[in-house]
């Protein structure tokens, strides 16, 4: 490998020997094409004309008046397919095509990465297979249909907790058997090197846009940036543009039923160092080192690991991470819907709930905050209605 793929002590490569050549091939291609004018011009074209970049930075006037902060929403929810995931899937699918691959496989939890992968596969004429835990298939039936309509085959995974962790396991098994013609399109800043670095690269467009936009409207950088964190790609994407500045970075994790309950997905808040899906980071595990099941009302946040750069940012104190319970996230969903008429994905609702908590502190009154609205809530409407006791 050309790079060591480390963020401090985190990251690296912990995979079967059979996958090392594929990872080396991927690293070489990524490092070459990220500096290739033709590749980058094609990527920028598809992000602009197909995905809908750049997205807006919306001043949420009503919410700002309600909370006492100047709140800006980075509107990644306005992208084609409904979330930030398309930034990465177009980038990786285009890279795979340049590498001569004809098939893409992916994992998905909430379904947004699966939809974005299916869309990218259709765009570039590639076969797509999506692994999805049966628990998530049940929670996200509409997204399953959207993937299938776009030409992807959705493969339910009934092992383990039947969620994202298990979908990743099956996707990795597939890749080991089909490395010659298949690219594994990982959806977050996790997994073995070069994935955390590569996904960050493709998602950093969020932060570059947000930085330019806030400077244009405010004339200065924000005090704080808030984003939800599962694997961590939307958060690292927006954090990346502010890491070298005096800007507070806050990640909102899936707190589930509360840390004390043990039924949560708050890996950084309550986990410990361990190896999961090819890299060293924080994981949820028992005393014997067995990976624990994660829980969140949001299918995109119930992952028992987290991207290695987030682990490094927490350890160094550059970013802090807070658990947000299911109840708080639901309140965040209702808050943004009521005051701005914008229904966030349940993942993004965790960031809104974190914002509400932030605004309650007297020292934060009047501060300027950017919240990354990573996805829209269409996919979650039936679940939210059920949680609110409303029949639809």
Curated annotation (Swiss-Prot):
Ordered alphabetically, the record's keywords are: Amino-acid biosynthesis, Aromatic amino acid biosynthesis, Lyase, Pyridoxal phosphate, Tryptophan biosynthesis
Q: What is its EC number?
A: 4.2.1.20
A cellular component term from Gene Ontology for this protein is:
cytoplasm
| Pfam families named among the record's database cross-references | PALP
Q: What reaction does this catalyse?
A: (1S,2R)-1-C-(indol-3-yl)glycerol 3-phosphate + L-serine = D-glyceraldehyde 3-phosphate + L-tryptophan + H2O
Give the metabolic or biological pathway. Amino-acid biosynthesis; L-tryptophan biosynthesis; L-tryptophan from chorismate: step 5/5
Q: Which molecular function terms from Gene Ontology are attached?
A: tryptophan synthase activity
N6-(pyridoxal phosphate)lysine PTM positions: 85
Give the enzyme class: lyase
What are the names of the required cofactors?
Answer: pyridoxal 5'-phosphate
User: Does the UniProt entry include the keyword Lyase?
Assistant: yes
Give the family this protein belongs to, as stated in its UniProt record.
Belongs to the TrpB family.
State whether it acts alone or in a complex, and with which partners, per the record: Tetramer of two alpha and two beta chains.
PANTHER family linked to this entry:
TRYPTOPHAN SYNTHASE, TRYPTOPHAN SYNTHASE-RELATED
Cited function? The beta subunit is responsible for the synthesis of L-tryptophan from indole and L-serine.
Task: Give the protein's recorded name.
Answer: Tryptophan synthase beta chain 1
Print the organism lineage: Archaea, Methanobacteriati, Methanobacteriota, Methanomada group, Methanobacteria
């Amino acid at each position: 490998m050309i790079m060591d793929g480390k963020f401090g002590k985190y990251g690296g490569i912990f995979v079967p020997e059979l996958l090392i050549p594929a990872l080396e091939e991927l690293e070489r291609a990524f490092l070459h094409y990220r500096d290739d004018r033709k590749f980058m011009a094609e990527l920028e074209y598809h992000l602009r004309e197909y995905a809908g970049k750049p997205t807006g930075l919306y001043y949420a006037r009503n919410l700002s008046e309600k909370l006492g902060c100047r709140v800006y929403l980075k509107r990644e929810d306005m992208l084609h397919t409904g979330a930030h995931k398309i930034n990465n899937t177009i980038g990786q699918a285009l890279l795979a095509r340049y590498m001569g691959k004809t098939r893409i496989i992916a994992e998905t939890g909430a379904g947004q990465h699966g939809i974005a992968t299916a869309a990218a596969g259709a765009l570039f004429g590639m076969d797509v297979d999506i692994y999805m835990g049966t628990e998530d298939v049940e929670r996200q039936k509409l997204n399953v249909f959207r993937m299938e309509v776009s030409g992807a085959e959705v493969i339910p995974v009934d092992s383990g907790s039947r969620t994202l962790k298990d979908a990743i396991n099956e996707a990795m098994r597939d890749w080991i058997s089909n490395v010659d013609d298949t690219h594994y399109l990982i959806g977050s800043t996790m997994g073995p090197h070069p994935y955390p670095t590569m996904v960050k690269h493709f998602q950093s467009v969020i932060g570059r846009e947000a930085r330019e936009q806030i400077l244009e409207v405010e004339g200065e950088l924000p005090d704080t940036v808030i984003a939800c964190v599962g694997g961590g790609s939307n958060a690292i994407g927006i954090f990346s543009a502010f890491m070298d500045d005096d800007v507070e970075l806050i990640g909102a994790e899936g707190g589930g039923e509360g840390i004390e309950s043990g039924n949560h997905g708050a890996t950084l808040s309550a986990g410990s160092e361990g190896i999961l899906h090819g890299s060293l980071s924080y994981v949820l595990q028992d005393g014997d080192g067995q990976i624990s099941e994660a829980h969140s009302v949001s299918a995109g946040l119930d992952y028992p690991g987290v991207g290695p750069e987030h682990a490094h940012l927490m350890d160094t104190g550059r970013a802090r991470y807070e658990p947000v319970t299911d109840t708080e996230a639901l309140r965040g969903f209702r808050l943004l819907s009521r005051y701005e008429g914008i229904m966030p994905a349940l993942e993004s609702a965790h960031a809104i709930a974190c914002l509400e908590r932030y605004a309650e502190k007297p020292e934060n009154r009047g501060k300027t905050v950017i919240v990354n609205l990573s996805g829209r809530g269409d996919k979650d409407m039936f679940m939210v209605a059920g949680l609110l006791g409303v029949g639809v």
